[in-house]
A protein has these predicted regions:
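Metal-dependent amide/peptide-bond hydrolase catalytic core
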Residues: 27, 243-488
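N-terminal signal peptide c-region/cleavage motif recognized by signal peptidases
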Residues: 21-23
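Acidic/His- and Gly-rich active-site-bordering loop/insert found
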Residues: 27-135, 144-165
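Glycine/charged-rich beta-loop-alpha catalytic/anionic-binding loops adjacent to active sites
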Residues: 120-136, 222-226, 376-378, 417-426
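Histidine/acidic-residue-rich, glycine-tolerant segments that coordinate divalent metal ions
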Residues: 124-134, 140-141, 157-277, 287
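Bacterial N-terminal signal peptides that target proteins for export
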Residues: 1-13
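Sec/Tat-exported extracytoplasmic proteins
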Residues: 43-47, 51, 55-58, 79, ...
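Divalent metal-coordination and catalytic microenvironments
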Residues: 54, 75, 95, 106, ...
Length: 488
Protein backbone atom coordinates (compact mmCIF):
# COMPACT_ATOMS: atom_id res chain seq x y z
CA UNK A 1 0.00 0.00 0.00
CA UNK A 2 2.84 2.36 0.83
CA UNK A 3 4.40 1.81 -2.59
CA UNK A 4 1.11 2.52 -4.38
CA UNK A 5 0.66 5.75 -2.45
CA UNK A 6 4.16 6.88 -3.33
CA UNK A 7 3.63 6.18 -7.03
CA UNK A 8 0.29 7.94 -6.92
CA UNK A 9 1.81 11.10 -5.47
CA UNK A 10 4.53 11.18 -8.10
CA UNK A 11 2.02 10.56 -10.86
CA UNK A 12 -0.25 13.32 -9.60
CA UNK A 13 2.66 15.76 -9.35
CA UNK A 14 3.80 15.01 -12.90
CA UNK A 15 0.23 15.16 -14.24
CA UNK A 16 -0.28 18.54 -12.60
CA UNK A 17 2.97 19.72 -14.11
CA UNK A 18 1.89 18.66 -17.60
CA UNK A 19 -1.48 20.41 -17.25
CA UNK A 20 0.32 23.52 -16.09
CA UNK A 21 2.51 23.56 -19.21
CA UNK A 22 -0.14 22.80 -21.82
CA UNK A 23 -0.94 26.45 -22.64
CA UNK A 24 2.61 27.09 -23.83
CA UNK A 25 2.49 24.03 -26.08
CA UNK A 26 -0.62 25.35 -27.76
CA UNK A 27 1.28 28.31 -29.15
CA UNK A 28 2.74 28.34 -32.67
CA UNK A 29 6.42 27.41 -32.34
CA UNK A 30 9.07 26.40 -34.83
CA UNK A 31 9.89 22.67 -34.86
CA UNK A 32 13.23 23.41 -33.17
CA UNK A 33 11.65 25.47 -30.38
CA UNK A 34 8.86 22.96 -29.90
CA UNK A 35 11.48 20.24 -29.57
CA UNK A 36 13.30 22.31 -26.93
CA UNK A 37 10.08 22.91 -25.01
CA UNK A 38 9.07 19.24 -25.17
CA UNK A 39 12.51 18.17 -24.00
CA UNK A 40 12.34 20.56 -21.04
CA UNK A 41 8.95 19.23 -20.00
CA UNK A 42 10.24 15.67 -20.22
CA UNK A 43 13.14 16.67 -17.98
CA UNK A 44 10.91 18.27 -15.34
CA UNK A 45 11.25 15.37 -12.86
CA UNK A 46 15.04 15.47 -13.25
CA UNK A 47 15.07 19.24 -12.66
CA UNK A 48 13.06 18.72 -9.49
CA UNK A 49 15.43 16.00 -8.31
CA UNK A 50 18.48 18.21 -8.90
CA UNK A 51 16.87 21.17 -7.15
CA UNK A 52 15.98 19.15 -4.07
CA UNK A 53 19.44 17.55 -3.89
CA UNK A 54 21.13 20.95 -4.07
CA UNK A 55 18.75 22.24 -1.38
CA UNK A 56 19.77 19.34 0.85
CA UNK A 57 23.49 19.97 0.26
CA UNK A 58 23.30 23.77 0.77
CA UNK A 59 27.06 24.18 0.45
CA UNK A 60 28.51 27.66 0.84
CA UNK A 61 30.82 29.57 -1.49
CA UNK A 62 33.79 27.60 -2.88
CA UNK A 63 32.77 24.61 -0.74
CA UNK A 64 30.11 23.32 -3.19
CA UNK A 65 31.84 19.94 -3.61
CA UNK A 66 28.78 17.66 -3.75
CA UNK A 67 26.72 20.24 -5.63
CA UNK A 68 29.26 20.74 -8.41
CA UNK A 69 29.89 17.00 -8.66
CA UNK A 70 26.17 16.27 -8.98
CA UNK A 71 25.62 18.72 -11.84
CA UNK A 72 28.85 17.88 -13.65
CA UNK A 73 28.12 14.14 -13.42
CA UNK A 74 24.62 14.59 -14.85
CA UNK A 75 25.96 16.61 -17.77
CA UNK A 76 28.73 14.11 -18.40
CA UNK A 77 26.27 11.21 -18.39
CA UNK A 78 24.23 13.08 -21.01
CA UNK A 79 27.24 13.28 -23.33
CA UNK A 80 28.66 16.69 -22.44
CA UNK A 81 32.42 17.11 -22.24
CA UNK A 82 33.10 18.43 -18.74
CA UNK A 83 36.23 20.25 -17.62
CA UNK A 84 36.33 20.39 -13.83
CA UNK A 85 38.26 22.58 -11.43
CA UNK A 86 38.65 25.45 -13.89
CA UNK A 87 40.09 28.90 -13.09
CA UNK A 88 41.79 27.60 -9.97
CA UNK A 89 38.49 26.74 -8.24
CA UNK A 90 37.79 23.05 -7.50
CA UNK A 91 34.02 23.58 -7.65
CA UNK A 92 33.96 25.45 -10.98
CA UNK A 93 33.38 23.56 -14.23
CA UNK A 94 32.57 24.04 -17.90
CA UNK A 95 30.42 21.52 -19.81
CA UNK A 96 30.14 21.58 -23.62
CA UNK A 97 28.12 19.69 -26.20
CA UNK A 98 28.15 20.00 -29.98
CA UNK A 99 30.67 21.62 -32.26
CA UNK A 100 31.26 24.81 -34.18
CA UNK A 101 29.44 28.10 -33.96
CA UNK A 102 27.49 29.65 -32.48
CA UNK A 103 28.64 28.94 -28.93
CA UNK A 104 25.72 29.71 -26.62
CA UNK A 105 26.35 29.69 -22.89
CA UNK A 106 24.07 29.23 -19.90
CA UNK A 107 25.19 30.17 -16.39
CA UNK A 108 24.52 27.90 -13.41
CA UNK A 109 24.95 28.82 -9.74
CA UNK A 110 24.63 26.47 -6.77
CA UNK A 111 26.19 28.00 -3.65
CA UNK A 112 24.21 28.53 -0.45
CA UNK A 113 24.31 31.16 2.28
CA UNK A 114 25.61 30.58 5.81
CA UNK A 115 23.18 30.75 8.71
CA UNK A 116 19.87 30.88 6.83
CA UNK A 117 19.00 27.18 6.74
CA UNK A 118 15.39 26.25 7.50
CA UNK A 119 12.98 23.41 7.04
CA UNK A 120 10.64 23.78 4.05
CA UNK A 121 7.82 24.99 6.29
CA UNK A 122 6.08 28.40 6.63
CA UNK A 123 7.67 29.27 9.97
CA UNK A 124 11.15 29.47 11.40
CA UNK A 125 12.28 25.90 12.13
CA UNK A 126 15.72 24.28 11.96
CA UNK A 127 16.40 21.51 9.49
CA UNK A 128 16.25 18.02 10.97
CA UNK A 129 19.68 17.16 9.53
CA UNK A 130 21.30 20.02 11.44
CA UNK A 131 22.53 21.88 8.34
CA UNK A 132 22.51 25.59 9.17
CA UNK A 133 23.35 26.99 5.75
CA UNK A 134 20.49 27.43 3.32
CA UNK A 135 19.29 28.35 -0.15
CA UNK A 136 18.15 31.83 0.78
CA UNK A 137 19.00 33.03 -2.73
CA UNK A 138 17.56 29.99 -4.50
CA UNK A 139 20.72 28.82 -6.20
CA UNK A 140 19.52 25.22 -5.90
CA UNK A 141 16.79 26.21 -8.34
CA UNK A 142 19.19 28.32 -10.42
CA UNK A 143 21.60 25.43 -10.94
CA UNK A 144 18.91 22.83 -11.58
CA UNK A 145 17.02 24.95 -14.13
CA UNK A 146 20.16 25.95 -16.02
CA UNK A 147 21.42 22.38 -16.26
CA UNK A 148 17.94 21.24 -17.25
CA UNK A 149 17.85 23.82 -20.04
CA UNK A 150 21.27 22.71 -21.29
CA UNK A 151 20.13 19.07 -21.36
CA UNK A 152 16.92 20.03 -23.17
CA UNK A 153 18.82 22.03 -25.77
CA UNK A 154 21.23 19.15 -26.33
CA UNK A 155 18.37 16.72 -26.93
CA UNK A 156 16.46 19.12 -29.16
CA UNK A 157 19.55 20.02 -31.20
CA UNK A 158 20.35 16.34 -31.72
CA UNK A 159 16.77 15.55 -32.75
CA UNK A 160 16.48 18.52 -35.12
CA UNK A 161 20.00 18.43 -36.55
CA UNK A 162 20.74 21.92 -35.21
CA UNK A 163 24.40 22.93 -35.35
CA UNK A 164 26.44 24.78 -32.77
CA UNK A 165 27.81 24.34 -29.26
CA UNK A 166 25.85 24.53 -26.04
CA UNK A 167 28.01 25.53 -23.06
CA UNK A 168 26.98 25.20 -19.42
CA UNK A 169 29.14 27.19 -17.02
CA UNK A 170 29.19 25.87 -13.47
CA UNK A 171 29.97 29.03 -11.51
CA UNK A 172 30.60 28.75 -7.76
CA UNK A 173 30.72 31.45 -5.09
CA UNK A 174 28.28 33.98 -6.49
CA UNK A 175 27.37 34.96 -2.96
CA UNK A 176 30.90 36.22 -2.38
CA UNK A 177 30.95 37.73 -5.90
CA UNK A 178 33.97 35.61 -6.79
CA UNK A 179 33.30 32.70 -9.16
CA UNK A 180 32.63 34.38 -12.49
CA UNK A 181 35.23 37.08 -11.80
CA UNK A 182 38.02 34.52 -11.76
CA UNK A 183 36.48 32.51 -14.60
CA UNK A 184 36.33 35.70 -16.67
CA UNK A 185 39.94 36.51 -15.79
CA UNK A 186 40.88 33.01 -16.99
CA UNK A 187 39.25 33.69 -20.38
CA UNK A 188 36.58 31.00 -20.08
CA UNK A 189 33.84 33.15 -21.63
CA UNK A 190 35.95 34.56 -24.45
CA UNK A 191 34.67 32.24 -27.19
CA UNK A 192 30.99 32.43 -26.23
CA UNK A 193 28.80 34.20 -28.79
CA UNK A 194 26.09 34.94 -26.19
CA UNK A 195 25.27 33.94 -22.62
CA UNK A 196 21.92 33.54 -20.86
CA UNK A 197 21.15 33.49 -17.15
CA UNK A 198 18.24 33.68 -14.77
CA UNK A 199 17.70 34.08 -11.04
CA UNK A 200 15.03 32.98 -8.58
CA UNK A 201 12.99 35.89 -7.32
CA UNK A 202 9.70 37.35 -6.18
CA UNK A 203 8.63 38.63 -9.61
CA UNK A 204 8.44 37.37 -13.18
CA UNK A 205 10.49 39.83 -15.20
CA UNK A 206 13.44 40.28 -17.52
CA UNK A 207 16.42 41.88 -15.84
CA UNK A 208 16.49 45.60 -16.66
CA UNK A 209 18.78 46.96 -13.94
CA UNK A 210 22.50 47.52 -14.25
CA UNK A 211 23.23 46.94 -10.57
CA UNK A 212 26.34 48.44 -9.02
CA UNK A 213 30.01 47.99 -9.72
CA UNK A 214 31.92 46.98 -6.60
CA UNK A 215 35.31 46.38 -4.98
CA UNK A 216 35.49 43.92 -2.09
CA UNK A 217 38.78 44.31 -0.21
CA UNK A 218 40.52 43.75 3.09
CA UNK A 219 43.02 46.03 4.83
CA UNK A 220 45.32 44.42 7.38
CA UNK A 221 47.35 46.41 9.90
CA UNK A 222 50.42 45.10 11.71
CA UNK A 223 51.66 46.73 14.93
CA UNK A 224 53.51 45.73 18.08
CA UNK A 225 51.98 44.01 21.10
CA UNK A 226 52.64 45.34 24.60
CA UNK A 227 50.98 45.44 28.02
CA UNK A 228 48.11 47.90 27.76
CA UNK A 229 48.80 49.32 31.21
CA UNK A 230 52.37 48.44 32.22
CA UNK A 231 54.18 49.58 29.07
CA UNK A 232 51.74 50.83 26.39
CA UNK A 233 54.50 53.15 25.09
CA UNK A 234 56.19 50.06 23.66
CA UNK A 235 53.06 49.11 21.72
CA UNK A 236 51.77 50.13 18.31
CA UNK A 237 48.06 49.37 18.03
CA UNK A 238 46.79 47.81 14.82
CA UNK A 239 43.28 48.42 16.15
CA UNK A 240 44.01 52.14 16.42
CA UNK A 241 44.92 52.03 12.74
CA UNK A 242 41.65 50.32 11.82
CA UNK A 243 39.66 52.84 13.84
CA UNK A 244 41.55 55.75 12.33
CA UNK A 245 40.95 54.40 8.83
CA UNK A 246 37.25 53.91 9.51
CA UNK A 247 36.98 57.42 10.93
CA UNK A 248 38.61 58.84 7.81
CA UNK A 249 36.24 56.90 5.56
CA UNK A 250 33.24 58.08 7.57
CA UNK A 251 34.35 61.69 7.06
CA UNK A 252 34.74 60.89 3.36
CA UNK A 253 31.04 59.95 3.10
CA UNK A 254 30.00 63.62 2.99
CA UNK A 255 31.96 64.11 -0.21
CA UNK A 256 30.96 61.12 -2.34
CA UNK A 257 28.05 60.88 -4.76
CA UNK A 258 24.49 59.94 -3.68
CA UNK A 259 24.90 56.72 -5.68
CA UNK A 260 27.97 55.63 -3.69
CA UNK A 261 27.74 52.89 -1.08
CA UNK A 262 30.55 52.13 1.41
CA UNK A 263 30.20 49.51 4.14
CA UNK A 264 32.64 47.70 6.40
CA UNK A 265 33.09 45.31 9.30
CA UNK A 266 36.05 44.65 11.61
CA UNK A 267 36.61 40.86 11.54
CA UNK A 268 39.78 41.07 13.65
CA UNK A 269 40.26 43.69 16.36
CA UNK A 270 42.55 42.17 18.98
CA UNK A 271 42.50 39.35 21.50
CA UNK A 272 42.26 40.95 24.98
CA UNK A 273 41.94 44.46 26.45
CA UNK A 274 45.20 44.16 28.37
CA UNK A 275 47.21 43.51 25.19
CA UNK A 276 47.89 46.23 22.65
CA UNK A 277 46.56 44.61 19.43
CA UNK A 278 49.41 43.81 17.08
CA UNK A 279 47.03 42.70 14.31
CA UNK A 280 43.66 43.99 13.13
CA UNK A 281 41.71 43.84 9.89
CA UNK A 282 38.98 45.89 8.22
CA UNK A 283 36.81 44.41 5.46
CA UNK A 284 35.28 46.89 3.01
CA UNK A 285 32.84 47.01 0.11
CA UNK A 286 32.68 50.12 -2.04
CA UNK A 287 29.99 50.36 -4.75
CA UNK A 288 28.77 52.81 -7.34
CA UNK A 289 26.89 52.84 -10.62
CA UNK A 290 29.97 52.33 -12.81
CA UNK A 291 33.46 50.88 -12.64
CA UNK A 292 35.20 54.24 -13.05
CA UNK A 293 33.50 55.68 -9.96
CA UNK A 294 34.30 52.63 -7.85
CA UNK A 295 37.96 52.91 -8.79
CA UNK A 296 38.00 56.59 -7.81
CA UNK A 297 36.56 55.95 -4.34
CA UNK A 298 38.74 52.87 -3.87
CA UNK A 299 41.90 54.86 -4.59
CA UNK A 300 40.81 57.48 -2.05
CA UNK A 301 40.17 54.84 0.63
CA UNK A 302 43.61 53.33 0.01
CA UNK A 303 45.16 56.73 0.73
CA UNK A 304 43.15 56.94 3.96
CA UNK A 305 44.45 53.48 4.93
CA UNK A 306 47.99 54.59 4.21
CA UNK A 307 47.50 57.69 6.35
CA UNK A 308 46.07 55.58 9.18
CA UNK A 309 49.16 53.38 9.12
CA UNK A 310 51.44 56.40 9.19
CA UNK A 311 49.51 58.00 12.05
CA UNK A 312 49.74 54.88 14.22
CA UNK A 313 53.25 53.78 13.23
CA UNK A 314 51.92 50.48 11.88
CA UNK A 315 52.36 48.62 8.62
CA UNK A 316 49.45 47.80 6.36
CA UNK A 317 48.58 45.50 3.48
CA UNK A 318 45.61 45.62 1.08
CA UNK A 319 44.04 42.56 -0.54
CA UNK A 320 41.46 43.11 -3.28
CA UNK A 321 39.31 40.01 -2.84
CA UNK A 322 37.15 40.66 -5.88
CA UNK A 323 35.78 43.42 -8.05
CA UNK A 324 32.96 43.65 -10.57
CA UNK A 325 31.51 45.98 -13.17
CA UNK A 326 27.92 47.12 -13.39
CA UNK A 327 25.71 44.87 -15.52
CA UNK A 328 25.94 45.58 -19.26
CA UNK A 329 22.37 45.13 -20.49
CA UNK A 330 21.67 43.79 -23.99
CA UNK A 331 18.35 44.94 -25.44
CA UNK A 332 17.94 42.35 -28.24
CA UNK A 333 18.50 39.50 -25.80
CA UNK A 334 16.20 41.12 -23.24
CA UNK A 335 13.43 41.30 -25.83
CA UNK A 336 13.95 37.66 -26.81
CA UNK A 337 13.75 36.58 -23.16
CA UNK A 338 10.63 38.70 -22.64
CA UNK A 339 8.90 37.08 -25.61
CA UNK A 340 9.72 33.59 -24.38
CA UNK A 341 8.75 34.37 -20.79
CA UNK A 342 5.37 35.51 -22.07
CA UNK A 343 5.22 32.38 -24.25
CA UNK A 344 5.81 30.03 -21.33
CA UNK A 345 3.80 31.95 -18.75
CA UNK A 346 4.16 32.18 -14.99
CA UNK A 347 4.23 29.23 -12.59
CA UNK A 348 0.71 27.95 -11.92
CA UNK A 349 0.72 27.80 -8.15
CA UNK A 350 -2.00 25.73 -6.49
CA UNK A 351 -4.30 27.02 -3.76
CA UNK A 352 -2.26 25.01 -1.25
CA UNK A 353 0.97 26.61 -2.46
CA UNK A 354 -0.52 30.09 -2.25
CA UNK A 355 -1.76 29.25 1.25
CA UNK A 356 1.81 28.26 2.21
CA UNK A 357 3.11 31.60 0.95
CA UNK A 358 0.42 33.56 2.80
CA UNK A 359 1.03 31.64 6.02
CA UNK A 360 4.71 32.50 5.74
CA UNK A 361 3.88 36.16 5.14
CA UNK A 362 1.53 36.16 8.14
CA UNK A 363 4.27 34.67 10.32
CA UNK A 364 6.52 37.55 9.25
CA UNK A 365 3.71 40.10 9.69
CA UNK A 366 3.74 40.95 5.98
CA UNK A 367 0.68 41.55 3.82
CA UNK A 368 -0.67 38.16 2.75
CA UNK A 369 -0.47 38.42 -1.04
CA UNK A 370 1.08 35.00 -1.74
CA UNK A 371 3.23 34.34 -4.79
CA UNK A 372 3.35 36.88 -7.61
CA UNK A 373 1.63 35.60 -10.75
CA UNK A 374 2.03 38.53 -13.13
CA UNK A 375 4.66 39.16 -15.82
CA UNK A 376 6.24 42.59 -15.62
CA UNK A 377 6.42 44.32 -19.03
CA UNK A 378 9.90 45.18 -20.28
CA UNK A 379 10.32 48.93 -19.87
CA UNK A 380 11.82 51.02 -22.65
CA UNK A 381 14.58 52.35 -20.40
CA UNK A 382 16.68 50.60 -17.74
CA UNK A 383 15.40 50.80 -14.19
CA UNK A 384 17.39 52.71 -11.55
CA UNK A 385 20.44 50.83 -10.31
CA UNK A 386 19.72 48.31 -7.58
CA UNK A 387 21.79 48.25 -4.41
CA UNK A 388 23.38 44.90 -5.15
CA UNK A 389 26.26 43.70 -7.28
CA UNK A 390 26.71 40.50 -9.27
CA UNK A 391 29.60 38.67 -10.87
CA UNK A 392 27.39 38.04 -13.92
CA UNK A 393 28.36 41.60 -14.81
CA UNK A 394 31.85 40.41 -15.75
CA UNK A 395 30.39 38.05 -18.34
CA UNK A 396 28.25 40.88 -19.71
CA UNK A 397 31.39 42.84 -20.63
CA UNK A 398 32.87 39.88 -22.51
CA UNK A 399 29.90 38.72 -24.58
CA UNK A 400 26.21 39.63 -25.05
CA UNK A 401 24.44 38.59 -21.84
CA UNK A 402 20.91 38.84 -20.48
CA UNK A 403 18.86 37.36 -17.66
CA UNK A 404 15.47 37.24 -16.02
CA UNK A 405 13.66 36.39 -12.79
CA UNK A 406 10.89 33.91 -12.10
CA UNK A 407 8.81 33.81 -8.94
CA UNK A 408 10.13 31.19 -6.53
CA UNK A 409 9.44 32.84 -3.16
CA UNK A 410 6.54 34.63 -1.51
CA UNK A 411 6.27 38.33 -2.26
CA UNK A 412 7.99 40.84 0.02
CA UNK A 413 9.55 38.35 2.45
CA UNK A 414 13.18 39.14 3.31
CA UNK A 415 15.60 37.85 0.69
CA UNK A 416 18.74 35.99 1.81
CA UNK A 417 16.80 34.71 4.81
CA UNK A 418 15.47 31.53 6.40
CA UNK A 419 12.11 32.35 4.81
CA UNK A 420 13.40 32.25 1.24
CA UNK A 421 15.35 29.09 2.08
CA UNK A 422 12.05 27.52 3.10
CA UNK A 423 10.34 28.55 -0.15
CA UNK A 424 13.19 27.22 -2.26
CA UNK A 425 12.81 23.75 -0.79
CA UNK A 426 9.21 23.36 -1.97
CA UNK A 427 7.51 22.19 -5.16
CA UNK A 428 6.32 25.77 -5.66
CA UNK A 429 9.95 26.83 -5.95
CA UNK A 430 10.59 23.98 -8.37
CA UNK A 431 7.72 25.21 -10.55
CA UNK A 432 9.57 28.49 -10.94
CA UNK A 433 12.74 26.63 -11.87
CA UNK A 434 10.94 24.66 -14.58
CA UNK A 435 9.48 27.85 -16.06
CA UNK A 436 13.01 29.27 -16.09
CA UNK A 437 14.40 26.16 -17.78
CA UNK A 438 11.80 26.49 -20.54
CA UNK A 439 12.56 30.17 -21.10
CA UNK A 440 16.31 29.45 -21.23
CA UNK A 441 15.83 26.54 -23.64
CA UNK A 442 13.53 28.50 -25.96
CA UNK A 443 15.81 31.55 -26.02
CA UNK A 444 18.85 29.35 -26.48
CA UNK A 445 17.20 27.75 -29.49
CA UNK A 446 16.39 31.22 -30.84
CA UNK A 447 20.10 32.03 -30.73
CA UNK A 448 21.01 28.77 -32.47
CA UNK A 449 18.47 29.20 -35.26
CA UNK A 450 17.97 32.96 -35.69
CA UNK A 451 21.17 34.46 -37.08
CA UNK A 452 19.63 37.94 -37.16
CA UNK A 453 18.91 37.86 -33.43
CA UNK A 454 22.46 36.81 -32.60
CA UNK A 455 23.94 39.41 -34.93
CA UNK A 456 21.72 42.10 -33.45
CA UNK A 457 22.79 41.15 -29.91
CA UNK A 458 26.44 41.24 -30.89
CA UNK A 459 26.12 44.58 -32.66
CA UNK A 460 24.37 46.05 -29.62
CA UNK A 461 27.15 44.71 -27.41
CA UNK A 462 29.79 46.38 -29.58
CA UNK A 463 27.93 49.68 -29.37
CA UNK A 464 27.64 49.46 -25.59
CA UNK A 465 31.29 48.59 -25.01
CA UNK A 466 32.70 50.81 -27.75
CA UNK A 467 34.65 47.84 -29.05
CA UNK A 468 36.91 47.86 -25.98
CA UNK A 469 38.18 44.54 -24.65
CA UNK A 470 37.24 43.36 -21.18
CA UNK A 471 39.64 44.26 -18.40
CA UNK A 472 39.46 42.35 -15.14
CA UNK A 473 39.41 44.50 -11.99
CA UNK A 474 41.86 42.02 -10.43
CA UNK A 475 45.64 41.78 -10.75
CA UNK A 476 46.60 39.31 -13.48
CA UNK A 477 48.45 36.98 -11.09
CA UNK A 478 45.83 36.88 -8.34
CA UNK A 479 44.48 33.46 -7.33
CA UNK A 480 40.96 32.76 -6.01
CA UNK A 481 40.51 33.11 -2.22
CA UNK A 482 39.95 29.41 -1.55
CA UNK A 483 38.65 28.38 1.89
CA UNK A 484 40.99 26.49 4.18
CA UNK A 485 38.33 24.26 5.72
CA UNK A 486 35.21 22.50 4.50
CA UNK A 487 31.96 23.74 5.94
CA UNK A 488 28.26 24.16 5.25
Amino acid sequence: MKSKTHVSKRALWFFALMIWTLPSQAQDLSPQKQAALDATEALSPEIRKMAMSLWQYSETALREVESAELLADILEEEGFTVERGVAGMPTAFVASYGSGEPVIGILAEYDALPGVGNAAVPQKAPREDGVTSGQGCGHNLFGAASVGAALALKRAMAAQGTGGTIRLYGTPAEETVVGKVYMAKAGLFDDADAVLEWHPGQENKVRNQRGRAMNNFEVEFFGQAAHSSADPWNGRSALDAVELMNYGVNLMREHVMPTTRIHYVIPRAGEAPNVVPEYAKAWYYVRDVDRESVQKWYDWILKIAEGAAMGTRTEHKVFLVTGVHEYNLNRPLQEALQANLEQVGVPAFTEEEQAFAKKLQAYLEIEETGYDTEITPLADEPEPASGGSTDVAEVSYITPTAGFNVTTAAADIPWHSWATSACHGTDAGVKGAIVAAKVLALTGMDLFTDAELLESAQNYFEEQTGGESYQSPLPSDQEPPLPTTSSR
